[in-house]
UniProtKB/Swiss-Prot annotation:
Belongs to the TDE1 family. Residues 2-39, 110-123, 173-197, 253-259, 331-387, 448-453 are cytoplasmic. GO terms for biological process: phospholipid biosynthetic process. It comes from the Eukaryota. It comes from Pongo abelii (Sumatran orangutan). This is Serine incorporator 1. The chain crosses the membrane at residues 40-60, 89-109, 124-144, 152-172, 198-218, 232-252, 260-280, 310-330, 388-408, 427-447. It is a multi-pass membrane protein.
Length: 453
């Protein structure tokens, strides 16, 4: 009897796996908007992929991965192939994830509403989509080595660079939303309390940035060397000061009354993180001490010796993973009314989301079964670009690939280590990020004929 009930329970999931409504999450949660639930499912699938990629790097997994035909053959370099199998496995797994999201991105170009037949693919058929993704990932493990890893290293670097910029855009959006929320509460009542909270958060961010700058100069520079690090730290410090001053200029405040130092402080902290991340990728070990050596432990060489495993888990990589998770899930649930950020992320403004969300009373809830269904709030128009969302997850897959492998590049004839290319990618992304933030401040003054409300 129990087995019959179990089969009946499993059968109730079939509409979720093959139907047009994403009820995978809704079975456990109250009914939600189709637009939000769908994005959360895609984000959770990417999170599962990240967890599997982390497992690939666990010591001992190379014995299982070596069983794949041709996966570790004809490799004669400084680093033994059995040490590199985790590195290669992450590349192939992330290649499969990236191709899955890229195909969906191309398929969803110019989808305008949920009435488009392609929207049913985006919002449903989960079993078939995930089965296709798994098939692509498995197939990626049988791609001949050749130049695959080298080519995909450069593709991953370009994609990770773009995703870092998207992280910055989402961070700008978060900072604006945070500031607006607290300013509104400050204006509604108990102004002293909220003003103190706003001031404390801003001061804390700037204090963290100042401490970071001091530590950078102490540990990542030397009087007679490390000139690149000195330049990176100094330039980014000056750029952050300039952006902070610009955010409170009278002209800027006149065009954007709610711009302020809180947003600038958040951008400053993120810029300091990118600066640190760039310096930790420098090939010269004297200008790139490990975190363990800084806190008092012995430093290990970037290039492993015979029989040693590669040190994958660096502090900046762990922080990078945390930022990645926050940004992906924030992009899945965000409903922003910041028009400049919405234009950059191809997302509708908050008013559209509210109007669509009100469609529940019009019978948009699925009738005729007891399964919780998502509310179709996109019948009149999508609330975000399906194509751009999948493209962002495509870039996120590449970012994860580079983060988990510490941006290392392996050349069989030589060794595996950090490259100056990775340093310049990260440091240039920090500069472009500050430029993007400054543009959100000055755009209303430059483009006076456009509405930025």
């Amino acid at each position: 009897m129990g087995s019959v009930l179990g089969l009946c329970s499993m059968a109730s999931w079939i509409p979720c796996l093959c139907g047009s409504a994403p009820c995978l999450l809704c079975r456990c949660c109250p009914s939600g908007n189709n637009s939000t639930v769908t994005r959360l499912i895609y984000a959770l699938f990417l999170l599962v992929g990240v967890c599997v990629a982390c497992v690939m790097l666990i010591p001992g997994m190379e014995e299982q991965l070596n069983k794949i035909p041709g996966f570790c053959e004809n490799e004669k370099g400084v680093v033994p192939c059995n040490i590199l199998v985790g590195y290669k496995a992450v590349y192939r797994l992330c290649f499969g994830l990236a191709m899955f999201y890229l195909l969906l991105s191309l398929l969803m170009i110019k989808v305008k509403s949920s009435s488009d037949p392609r929207a049913a693919v985006h919002n449903g058929f989960w079993f078939f989509k995930f089965a296709a993704a798994i098939a692509i990932i498995i197939g990626a493990f049988f791609i001949p080595e050749g130049t695959f890893t080298t080519v995909w290293f450069y593709v991953g670097m370009a994609g990770a660079f773009c995703f870092i910029l998207i992280q910055l855009v989402l961070l700008i959006d978060f900072a604006h939303s945070w500031n607006e929320s607290w300013v509104e509460k400050m204006e509604e009542g108990n102004s002293r309390c909220w003003y103190a909270a706003l001031l404390s958060a801003t001061a804390l961010n700037y204090l963290l940035s100042l401490v970071a700058i001091v530590l950078f100069f102490v540990y990542y520079t030397h009087p007679a060397s490390c000139s690149e690090n000195k330049a990176f730290i100094s330039v980014n410090m000056l750029l952050c000061i300039g952006a902070s001053v610009m955010s409170i200029l009278p002209k800027i405040q006149e065009s954007q009354p709610r711009s302020g130092l809180l947003q600038s402080s958040v951008i400053t902290v993120y810029t300091m993180y990118l600066t640190w991340s760039a310096m930790t990728n420098e090939p010269e070990t004297n200008c790139n001490p490990s975190l363990l050596s800084i806190i008092g432990y012995n430093t290990t060489s970037t290039v492993p010796k015979e029989g040693q495993s590669v040190q994958w888990w660096h502090a900046q990589g762990i922080i990078g993973l945390i930022l990645f998770l926050l940004c992906v899930f924030y992009s899945s649930i965000r409903t922003s009314n910041n028009s400049q950020v919405n234009k950059l992320t191809l997302t509708s403004d908050e008013s559209t989301l509210i109007e669509d969300g009100g469609a529940r009373s019009d019978g948009s809830l699925e009738d005729g079964d007891d399964v919780h269904r998502a509310v179709d709030n996109e019948r009149d128009g999508v609330t975000y670009s399906y194509s751009f969302f999948h493209f962002m997850l495509f870039l996120a897959s590449l970012y994860i690939m580079m983060t988990l492998t510490n941006w290392y590049r392996y050349e069989p004839s030589r060794e595996m280590k950090s490259q100056w290319t990775a340093v310049w990618v990260k440091i240039s992304s920090s500069w472009i990020g500050i430029v993007l933030y400054v543009w959100t401040l000055v755009a209303p003054l430059v483009l006076t004929n456009r509405d930025f409300d």
